[in-house]
Regions:
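Sec-dependent signal peptide recognition
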Residues: 2-10
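Hydrophobic h-region of N-terminal signal peptides that target proteins for export
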Residues: 11-18
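N-terminal cap/lid segment of alpha/beta-hydrolase-fold proteins
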Residues: 21-72
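Serine-hydrolase catalytic-loop signature spanning alpha/beta hydrolases and amidase-signature enzymes
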Residues: 85-87, 109
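Short beta-strand element of the alpha/beta-hydrolase
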Residues: 74-83
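A fold-wide structural signal in alpha/beta-hydrolase
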Residues: 77, 103-110
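Catalytic nucleophile-loop/oxyanion-hole region of alpha/beta-hydrolase
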Residues: 89-92, 97, 112-131
């Protein structure tokens, strides 16, 4: 029984790692927890994905780092803030795919999954300033 539990744990850890690496990011950083952020957005519901790669109800800011290809690294970096009209984040083609392009061209990219404003316009601005 112990061997089965160990095997299942290892498989779950590998599956989580594979999911985190789907787009090539090598590091994930929480910008801050809701206790240290200057303002909260009042969203109490869990983050949702009503459409594929479209996030809503984001209440935790996270930075996904895509390092430049070492042989092409220029020493430059960019922070990408995906659009969505402050209602959702189009995190794939306006975030991850752009970051991959920059990384392939020697520029380290960081995709910011910023908190939705939910009537508090200062919240996403604080996230990008902190990033």
């Amino acid at each position: 029984m112990k061997r089965i539990a160990t095997t299942l744990t290892a498989l779950l850890l590998m599956a989580g790692t594979a999911t985190a690496q789907d787009y090539g990011q090598t590091r994930t950083l929480k910008i801050w927890d809701n206790k240290t952020a200057p303002h909260g957005n009042g969203i109490a519901t869990p983050e949702r994905e009503p459409e594929k790669n479209r996030l809503t109800d984001v209440s935790e800011a996270v930075l996904y780092i895509f390092p430049a290809a070492p042989e092409k690294a220029t020493g430059q970096a960019v922070v990408i803030c995906p659009g969505g009209g402050y209602v959702k984040l189009c995190i794939d083609y306006e975030g991850y795919e752009m970051a991959q392009w920059f990384a392939e061209h020697g520029i380290t990219a960081a995709v910011l999954k910023y908190r939705m404003p939910n009537g508090h316009p200062e919240v996403p601005l604080e996230d990008v300033e902190q990033a």
